[in-house]
Every structure is written in C-alpha cells, then in structure tokens.
Amino acid sequence: MPSFADLTTENGLVELNKFVSDKTYIVGFVPSSADVQAFNLVKTAPCATKYPHAARWFNTIASYSAAEQGQFEKVTETVTIAAPAAPKADDDVDLFGSDDEDDEEYERQLEERRKKAMEHKKPKETVIAKSSILLDVKPWDDETDMVELEKCVRSIEMDGLVWGASKLVAVGYGIKKLVINLVVEDLKVSTDELEEKIKDFEDYVQSVDVAAFNKI
C-alpha cells in the first residue's frame, strides 16, 4: 500500500511527487478510492514548479466533483501516513554540547557551502518533456494469442520509450484487449509512429487507441 510522510509537509509532497512521476493514478489505471483518500490528505494544490507530478495528479482528481469521486472504483489498497520519528528524550539532550560536536557541525556547514558553490557553477540541466500514455490494443477475435500480442508490442524499441505495466481487460464475447502503460520523451517519440509500428503486427492487432494521455 502507498505510504507517505504527512502530505501537508514538504517531505510528504516530495514523496508523493516521486511516487506519481510515472503514474496517472495512485493505484491502477483508473481513478479509485485511493486517489480520493490521498487527495483529501493533501488538502491544497501542490506547487506546480516544485512538485509538477503531484500537481498534475492533484488537478486531475480535483477536476471531478465530490459526487463523481464517490463513484470511483473502490480498491483494497489504502494510503498510509508514516509516523514521524520520535523526538529525542529530554534526558538525552546535552545542553552544553562538546568541542567534537562543534567541529563536526562546522565541517558539515563548510561542506554544504562547498556543494552550493559547485551547484552554481554547474550548467542548468535541460528539462526533458515526457508524457504518460495508456494504450488499448485490440485483437481480431477471441482466438488471438494475447501473450504473443503483448510480446510483439513490447518488442518495439525506440529511443525515449519505456514500457510500463499492462493487463488484459475483457471487452465481450470472450475477447480481451491489452491495456498497457508507457512513458515517452515527447521530442523523441511520435505517438502516431508508435501506433503504426504496433499495427504492423497485423496478424494479432486489429486496432490501437490512446485511452489516456498525461504530461509528466
């Protein structure tokens, strides 16, 4: 189950931002009760500059009304808030400290200044625009080998393309479609080109549709 520090604190938002960096929702491929729980724990929209992934996720959930959120898929996974570290006992506090501790603190501060000075000298890193995409890949019929179909899809390699989780979803009459998540670098991967590559496996694939698309 997802676990974070207090989501009203900077530590909690840092953890949430990292957690949803490659996800659209907290659990699975559709909004669920876990998203509502986390949304209520965050309370206010995260800063889009400091926490872009958390802000994108928060705004997605905020776009649904309370009534709509109540209709989200109910999941067994729940969001937990990790207990903060216990404060140091009073009788363990050294009110006067020691020379060794003073020296260590001085060295630590000196090292921090060195690191900050080096960071200013480093060229700024270019932000790489990425997108999280959910594809629906439909077979011709119920006799299509879905294991081979998925192998074919995952065999596609493109610079800037990373395949993620997948599952088979029933669509009726014994037919199942492949729902697969992927992350692409926008400047390197064309979704149209990717769809055409998947459709080239014409013995298995009838159609490819984008079910969800989110900038990350």
UniProtKB/Swiss-Prot annotation:
GO terms for cellular component: cell cortex; cytoplasm; cytosol; eukaryotic translation elongation factor 1 complex; phagocytic vesicle. InterPro entries: eEF-1beta-like_sf, EF-1_beta_acid_region_euk, EF1B_bsu/dsu, EF1B_bsu/dsu_GNE, Glutathione-S-Trfase_C_sf, Transl_elong_EF1B/ribsomal_bS6, Transl_elong_EF1B_B/D_CS. Keywords: Cytoplasm, Elongation factor, Protein biosynthesis. GO terms for molecular function: actin monomer binding; guanyl-nucleotide exchange factor activity; translation elongation factor activity. Pfam families: EF-1_beta_acid, EF1_GNE. SMART domains: EF1_GNE. Belongs to the EF-1-beta/EF-1-delta family. EF-1 is composed of 4 subunits: alpha, beta, delta, and gamma. Interacts with actin. This is Elongation factor 1-beta. It comes from Dictyostelium discoideum (Social amoeba).
